[in-house]
A protein has these predicted regions:
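Central cavity-lining transmembrane alpha-helices of secondary-active solute carriers
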Residues: 58-72, 123-127, 313-325
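Extracellular/periplasmic helix-loop-helix junction of adjacent transmembrane segments
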Residues: 38-66, 106-108
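Hydrophobic transmembrane architecture of multi-pass small-molecule transporters
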Residues: 409-503, 512-529
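Helix-loop-helix hairpins in multi-pass membrane proteins, especially solute transporters
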Residues: 68-206, 224
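Cytosolic juxtamembrane N-terminal segment immediately preceding the first transmembrane helix
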Residues: 1-30, 44
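12-transmembrane solute porter fold
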Residues: 14-27, 35-37, 50, 228, ...
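Helix-breaking motifs and short loop linkers at transmembrane-helix boundaries and internal kinks
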Residues: 45-47, 79, 100-106, 168-169, ...
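Hydrophobic transmembrane-helix bundles of small-molecule transporters
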Residues: 166-278, 285, 303, 311
């Protein structure tokens, strides 16, 4: 018995468990960003199309989002460490399949499905393991460290993807992830074992199935927008039906005294609803814009993956800077003010970017807009959790954290899906303008098909099939410029909605004791310090 207690004490003293779960957080976050810059090479290597790659990228985050709530419950039933290691195993198998992919189907199975499932199982357990391993003083540092590692992964993801794709192969990205998983397994004995906190009978399987179907149909509906509007509407309607079934079932389960997947009573908290919506919008804007800009740079400018990654650094770097400064700024200013400033900066960035895209665009042209977009959304994302869970009890905070992570991950999937569709729809609309200007007497249908094929393959076609080089360049310029304008218009409107939502936040819930204490010390600092010194002397 003493030996077991000593082992657990040693694990609490060691930072190795933190390093292991932080590594998992690193590769999961890296996975969501590094493949965007490899789109052109994926199309070439796997003999596929932009639409297929678009679907694969969207489904990776969708798989993670749809299973996040279920994974949060499973860790209480099976055990935090067990569910974390199971997720790592599935993730590692997915990385092997993705690295060896010979076609888009293999990549979909390995990356979108298996790595998505593995990431969903590991993500909730990462925070739970940290909270269960370290005491209050060390826990604050551990949580901040894991969060910072995730931020670094998001910032370097495009550059990492660009480097391995250009100088090695995108397959090495998955090989790197596999190496990290092997390290986690090699040192897994250092992670503390946690006893299950719930019985298997408490698992809400039906609610989990309803939630998965709802989210999958929602994203499929978005992806179908560019192909079949009627089918898209049908999918949206069915998704709403399943959402209603999910809500009704969860409320019925709660009324019967059973434990639901989600306690619907938690949504009475206005700040939680606002926080979920705000983070959802922020992730749509961020991941959607990264995808659209990557497509433009590789499709119109013929940038390789490394150059594409370099051009995305201002945005991802801005997110990292905001993440590092947000907590310090929140001691001085209210969350509502900071998040409003974040949305305003992001809107300015989107408006600037609207006028920058063309065949002669350079890094210096898009860097200011990308940086403003990144630093603004970084503030919003970093403060969104604190806004949502402030004042909740511990049990409610756990449920709320799962909902917030789900909304953020779903936002990533919807962002890639929606803005990818807008990019393609915008490009299609631009073809008519281009043909009218440069070849008014030509068969428009012929050039719509030709330009559409060109975009789907990101230029990996026989150039003679689409007009002369000069006319093709001019048409491509108009097509993609119009498409990027539409993307940035949509992004600005979306961010404006987010800005409006920040004004629904109850600021009283997020101004904590620390802010009030700082304000008091600013007004009475010298006197307060002297009084404390005098009191100390009197006691002596």
């Amino acid at each position: 018995m003493k030996k077991v207690k000593k082992m657990n004490a040693n694990k609490q003293e060691s930072w190795l468990p933190l390093v292991l779960v932080a590594l998992a957080s690193f590769i999961i976050t890296l996975d969501a960003t590094f493949m965007n810059v490899s789109i052109s090479q994926l199309i070439l290597d796997l003999n596929t199309s932009l639409s297929t790659v678009h679907l694969i990228i969207s489904f990776y985050t969708l798989t993670t989002a749809s299973l996040m709530l279920i994974a949060s419950k499973l860790q209480d039933i099976i055990g935090k460490k067990k569910i974390f290691m199971l997720g790592a195993l599935i993730y590692g198998i997915g990385a092997i399949i993705a690295a060896l992919s010979q076609n888009s189907a293999m990549l979909f199975i390995g990356w979108s499905l298996l790595e998505g499932i593995g990431g969903a199982l590991m993500t909730p357990a990462i925070i739970s393991i940290i909270i269960g391993t370290y005491d209050k003083n060390r826990r604050t540092f551990a949580l901040a460290f894991a969060s910072a590692i995730g931020g670094i992964a998001a910032a370097i993801g495009p550059m990492f993807g660009g480097f391995v794709t250009t100088f090695l192969s995108w397959r090495f990205g998955f090989a790197f992830e596999l190496a990290v998983i092997i390290i986690i397994f090699a040192y897994s004995k250092n992670i503390k074992n946690f006893k299950p906190q719930s019985r298997k009978t408490n698992f809400d399987l039906i609610g989990g199935i309803y939630s998965i179907i709802t989210l999958v149909l929602l994203v499929l509906g978005v992806l179908e927008l560019k192909k079949n509007m009627l089918l898209s509407i049908v999918l949206f309607i069915i998704s709403i039906v399943f959402l209603r079934l999910f809500i009704s079932y969860e409320m019925k389960l709660k009324a019967s005294g059973a434990i639901p997947l989600v306690d619907m009573g938690i949504f009475k908290n206005n700040n939680l609803l606002a926080g979920m919506a705000i983070r959802f919008i922020a992730m749509i804007a961020m991941m959607g814009c990264l995808f659209a800009v990557s497509v433009f740079l590789q499709g119109a400018l013929k940038f390789n993956a490394f150059d594409t990654g370099i051009n995305l650094i201002p945005a991802t770097g801005g997110v990292l800077i905001s993440a590092l400064l947000a907590e310090r700024l929140s001691r001085i200013y209210s969350h509502k003010i900071l998040m409003s400033i974040g949305f305003v900066l992001a809107i300015i960035g989107a408006v600037i970017l609207r006028f920058q895209f063309g065949l002669h665009v350079t890094f210096l042209d898009i860097a200011p807009g990308m940086f403003l977009l990144g630093i603004g959304l970084g503030l919003v994302i970093a403060l969104g959790i604190d806004v949502s869970i402030k004042g909740m009890d511990e049990e409610s905070q756990s449920t709320a954290s799962g909902l917030l992570t789900t909304s953020q991950t779903l936002g990533s999937s919807i962002g890639t899906a929606v803005i990818g569709c807008i990019l393609i729809i915008g490009a299609t609309a631009g073809i008519a303008d281009a043909v009218d200007i440069y070849v008014p007497d030509a068969n428009q249908t012929q050039f719509e098909v030709g330009t559409g094929d060109y975009l789907e393959k990101l230029g990996n076609l026989n150039e003679s099939s689409i007009l002369s080089q000069d006319v093709k360049a001019k048409i491509t310029n108009i097509v993609l410029t119009d498409a990027m304008k539409m993307v940035m218009d949509f992004t600005a409107i979306l961010l404006l909605i987010g800005l409006i939502l920040t004004h629904t936040i109850d600021n009283r819930r997020v101004i904590g004791r620390r802010i009030r204490r700082l304000r008091t010390e600013r007004l009475n600092g010298p006197k307060v310090r002297l009084d404390r010194q005098k009191l100390s002397k009197d006691r002596k």
